[in-house]
């Protein structure tokens, strides 16, 4: 280490000049901090203390006085010399000269949902897809006997009955019956929606309190909540298969016994829009949403009874909140009754009287999916305003979350 003599303040070895005086780094740092002190030290009684003695600096007042006596000048203290401050100041200067960094939205003067909007591609005339036959089939499902007999002795309450119904939907020999899709087009989309709608109808038909509702209530609940039912049920199914290593990460369930890998499948939107998938990137759901939810489900590892309560709470809460009035009252009564059954399940069957933390995690997952659905509805409303889609459904409310 090069030496430039002794510090003019404390007498220690120094390496250079600071604030106009040959001084050590310690005294230089001390003098640099001195102007920022919020309190002042009282006058020293001795007024001539040894600055550095026995490895310690004794009196701050005398040390500061000595710094001033040897010629240290506060005007020579330079501010904003650290790397963070310097980079911030540089960024401010760049912004002042060139303006803020431009995103594509800022550069083109369009919000992200209009980034690729081309008026000549807008679809002012729509092709109507008739889905009334689905409602007719659902009505017939509600008129016939439930999938699982209510006289079965294998269940304790209606929540357990729903659990048996959902378990019956899933294939037994899953390794041989899963079909991996590589392309999603018109036929695949319509088939998956039909399967999901009718499966949700069959599931609801196994709930006695639901079947006691008026016909219009049952259909309204189904039409407004089947997509919520599908979203959560398929993620729970994918979580089970990923946990048991039947499916790898990034592979989702998308139909009855079918799945797709997000990184491998091709989507064909030509049947429903004139825009490309790249142009519609704003309107498409990010893949991270589904995988994050599946990871949360794997960590929680809910039982079949818990899964059915989660699905019931999500769907009925969504349907009741949307319709209000008598239907809201009916859905709240059903949820309350099933919450009591869930309590009995925890206390009597699994011997878990303190289940509040687990229930909170379940409801957190449901709130996340509810938030996704709100975002999806808003984006679909924007798409309708700008005629992004060239098809419409005969019952638009059934597909407002697609």
From Swiss-Prot:
Subcellular location: Nucleus
Zinc fingers typed NR C4-type, residue spans: 7-27, 44-67
Pfam family, one: zf-C4
InterPro entries the UniProt entry points to: C.elegans_Orphan_NR, HNF4-like_DBD, NHR-like_dom_sf, Nucl_hrmn_rcpt_lig-bd, Znf_hrmn_rcpt, Znf_NHR/GATA
Residue spans binding DNA: 4-79
Keywords: DNA-binding, Metal-binding, Nucleus, Receptor, Transcription, Transcription regulation, Zinc, Zinc-finger
GO molecular function ontology, one term from the record: RNA polymerase II cis-regulatory region sequence-specific DNA binding
GO cellular-component term (any): nucleus
Known role: Orphan nuclear receptor.
PANTHER family: NUCLEAR HORMONE RECEPTOR FAMILY (PTHR45680), NUCLEAR HORMONE RECEPTOR FAMILY-RELATED (PTHR45680:SF28)
Family that this chain belongs to: Belongs to the nuclear hormone receptor family.
Name under which the protein is recorded: Nuclear hormone receptor family member nhr-96
Gene: nhr-96
């Amino acid at each position: 280490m090069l030496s430039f003599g002794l510090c003019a303040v404390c007498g220690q070895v120094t390496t250079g000049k600071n604030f106009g005086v040959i001084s050590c780094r310690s005294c230089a740092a001390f003098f640099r901090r001195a102007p920022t002190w919020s309190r002042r030290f009282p006058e020293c009684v001795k007024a001539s203390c040894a600055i550095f003695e026995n490895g310690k600096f004794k009196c701050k007042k005398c040390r500061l006085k000595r710094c001033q006596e040897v010629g240290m000048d506060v005007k020579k203290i330079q501010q904003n010399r650290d790397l963070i401050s310097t980079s911030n100041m540089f960024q401010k200067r760049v912004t002042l000269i060139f303006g803020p960094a431009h995103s594509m939205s800022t550069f083109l003067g369009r919000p992200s949902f209009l980034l690729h909007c081309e008026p000549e591609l807008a679809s002012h005339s729509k092709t109507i897809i008739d889905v009334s036959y689905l409602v007719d089939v659902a009505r017939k499902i509600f008129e016939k006997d439930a999938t699982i007999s209510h006289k079965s002795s294998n269940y304790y309450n209606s929540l357990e009955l729903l659990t048996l119904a959902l378990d019956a939907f899933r294939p037994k020999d899953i390794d041989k019956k899963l079909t991996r899709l590589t392309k999603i087009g018109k036929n695949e989309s319509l088939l998956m929606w039909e399967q999901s709608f009718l499966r949700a109808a069959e599931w609801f038909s196994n709930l006695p309190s639901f079947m006691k509702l008026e016909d219009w209530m049952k259909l309204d609940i189904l039409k407004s909540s089947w997509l919520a039912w599908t979203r959560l049920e398929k993620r729970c199914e994918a979580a089970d298969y990923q946990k048991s290593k039947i499916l790898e990460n990034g592979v989702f369930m998308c139909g009855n016994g079918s799945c797709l890998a997000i990184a491998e499948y091709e989507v064909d939107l030509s049947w429903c829009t004139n825009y490309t998938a790249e142009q519609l990137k704003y309107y498409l759901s990010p893949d991270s949403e589904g995988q994050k939810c599946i990871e949360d489900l794997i960590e929680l590892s809910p039982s079949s009874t818990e899964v059915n309560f989660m699905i019931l709470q999500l769907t009925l809460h969504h349907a009741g909140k949307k319709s209000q009035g008598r239907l809201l009252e009916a859905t709240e009564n059903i949820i309350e009754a099933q919450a009591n059954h869930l309590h009995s399940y925890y206390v009597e069957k699994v011997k878990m009287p303190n289940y509040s933390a687990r229930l909170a995690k379940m409801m957190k997952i449901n709130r996340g999916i509810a938030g996704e659905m709100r975002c999806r509805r808003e984006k679909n409303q924007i798409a309708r305003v700008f005629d992004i889609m060239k098809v419409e459904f005969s019952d638009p409310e059934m597909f407002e979350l697609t």
